[in-house]
């Protein structure tokens, strides 16, 4: 019986040390952060847990999660570049965000015109879309996109479903055509 109790206490101690840190889908590998500014990163950990955030460009921040486990930090970002960066978020366990770029972030939102992907819909093809998709790997290090799933809400949301994507032949067909042509033009103008 003593061995069983000792084992249970040991397992409880291991579980408490292995606290989980979670992030919303909008904060992840392959994301782009706005250059030369203070960006907010947030997530969830155990209630009242210490959270440390460190970026490969030298920025660091720490916070303590609130009673519901939510935390938020602000990081200073450097000038934009195409050099991939890394962000580590730690609170018990560790989340590593790889292949993060620093540059220009633009939100493209709307209805059917904005939603039309480069791959087109059914009979609706995008002029030049197939060529862009075929050559998309050339833009892999320059353009990223986050396709947020359809949803609605009447209050601000901390979590929205979606994931950051590099612009590649495998992902380009899902990217908004309008957003792509804007990003490509902006990339040429700013370089």
Short names for language-model regions:
Residues 4-13:
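Sec-dependent N-terminal signal peptides
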Residues 19-191:
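Cell-envelope and extracellular/periplasmic
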Residues 14-18:
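C-terminal segment of classical bacterial N-terminal signal peptides
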């Amino acid at each position: 019986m003593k061995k069983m109790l000792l084992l249970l206490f040991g397992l409880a101690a291991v579980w408490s040390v292995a606290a989980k840190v979670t992030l919303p889908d909008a904060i992840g590998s392959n994301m782009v952060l706005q250059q030369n500014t203070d960006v907010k990163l947030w997530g969830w950990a155990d209630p009242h847990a210490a959270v440390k955030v460190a970026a490969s460009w030298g920025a660091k921040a720490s916070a303590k999660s609130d009673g519901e486990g939510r935390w938020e930090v602000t990081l200073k970002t450097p000038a934009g570049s195409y050099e991939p960066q890394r962000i580590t978020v730690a609170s018990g366990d560790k989340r590593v965000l790889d292949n993060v770029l620093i540059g220009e972030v633009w939100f493209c939102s709307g209805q059917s015109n904005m939603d039309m992907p480069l791959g087109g819909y059914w009979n609706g093809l995008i002029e030049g879309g197939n060529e862009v998709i075929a050559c998309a790997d050339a833009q892999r290090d320059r353009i990223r996109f986050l396709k947020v799933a359809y949803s609605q809400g009447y209050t601000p949301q901390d979590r929205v479903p979606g994931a950051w994507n590099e612009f590649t032949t495998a992902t380009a067909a899902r990217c908004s055509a309008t957003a792509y042509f804007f990003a490509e033009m902006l990339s040429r103008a700013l370089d």
